[in-house]
Amino acid sequence: MDSRPLTLGEIALARSMFGDAIDYRRVRLFRRKWWPFHPKGAAMAPSGNIHFHPERGGWSEDFSSEPLSLQGFFIHELTHVWQAQARGRLYLPLRRHPFCRYRYRLAPGKPFNAYNPEQQAEIVRHIFLAERGVRLADTPPRSILPF
């Protein structure tokens, strides 16, 4: 199968973080490159769908039944889906440059939107993991999220 919609379990998992901020019916997962130079070790979600390189091991038939680490990866990618749906399909291609940093430093009063797209996705992933018992050094408060 080349693509699929989200499973009911994945939608429930996503709702635990995003609520109704994502139109889950519009999201598809593709087991094919987003563009010809799609790196093998990366999933890409610049257009509101998630693309997995066909030679990469990150694909799942249902992320809700995967280990917590893969669920966190899925939540990270769904943050990019939310960005595309909330800010437009050009948001990621225009804001996410090749040297975009994933690591972030929380700054008091700094709004979520002031972090770059990858940092936003990591913030959401870290909150997701922390709420499920994973101990992280500096977990952001859920109140930083705009959804």
In which residue ranges do the predicted regions lie?
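Metalloprotease/metallohydrolase-associated module, dominated by Zn2+-dependent proteases
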Residues: 2-28, 38-39, 45-48, 85-147
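Active-site recognition of the HExxH zinc-binding catalytic motif
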Residues: 72-84
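Short C-terminal domain-edge/linker segments immediately following a structured domain
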Residues: 57-62, 81-85, 104
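Short pre-active-site segment immediately N-terminal to the catalytic Zn-binding motif
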Residues: 42, 53-75, 112-113
